[in-house]
Amino acid sequence: MKIVVIGGSGLIGSKLVTKLREQGHEAVAASPKSGINTLTGEGLAEALKGAAAVVDVSNSPSWEDSDVMKFFETSTRNLLASETAAGVRHHVALSVVGSERMLESGYFRAKIAQENLIKASSIPYSIVRATQFFEFVKGIADISTEGNKVRLPHVLFQPMAADDVASAVGKVAMGTPVNGTVEVGGPEKFRLDEVVRRGLAAWTDSREVVADPHARYYGIEVSERTLVPGDDARLGETRFETWLTLPASKAAAAALVHSFPVPLAFVVRRLENSRSMLPPILPARPTAALVKTRPAPRFARG
């Protein structure tokens, strides 16, 4: 079966392409690098010829609210139109658990808009919502650090390995469209501060993790269950303590990336607008240089 993976060169996409090929499928890694651009429509018609399914794990290259909305709406419309013309019978999209509970962020408003476009189309579909990845635990610490303290809300957290995300998406893509949403998460529930504390300890990082009821998660106010899936979620196999011993853990610890699809500029604006109400998780006077030099935060969709 031919399956086209949009965003096929990213963290999840590259793993997914490998897994699909191991199962004997013709998996096409589609991205601007390979001449396939969903935002402009370039290369889509040719790439989708003969495809039975399309999996979209792509992400916006810009993190401004208007740019993110434009990316997801435009690319999804282009993709769905091309799929209709090519006769694709299964559209799979990777989204985020709790998106509808985090509409304070323009990114999640855009993800909901993407989901709504998919639901309104005539193409059978499956939306896979995943929890945060183990690979980005360090990024959560980095963006929540002041001095030597990491301040985080003491809320439930059910992260999973990126490899398990790719496996879950692959199983859905190879199956029958559910015409609905599938949630996937890790095999264990933790408290957010607990996961970060364990990760930093494993990486011999001396920062102190503090559970702060007033702390926000990337500038977003979260409640007890904002970040966890429902009880019927499909669970990955990799436990956090096991993952911490793997090469992926060491690579994640060494990487300077931010781990959630909320741009630093958004966090800065939230803090500047509500300084007295928020914990000091960023310098008191964020500068343009800081915004420009920090890598783009991401919940790696691709």
Identify what each model region corresponds to.
Residues 87-90, 95, 113-136, 143:
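Conserved beta-loop-beta element that borders a ligand/cofactor-binding pocket
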Residues 225, 232-267, 281:
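Amphipathic terminal alpha-helices
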Residues 135-147, 172-182, 205-207:
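Glycine/proline-rich active-site loop of Rossmann-fold NAD(P)-dependent oxidoreductases
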Residues 165-169, 184, 192-195, 243:
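Non-catalytic, hydrophobic alpha-helical segments
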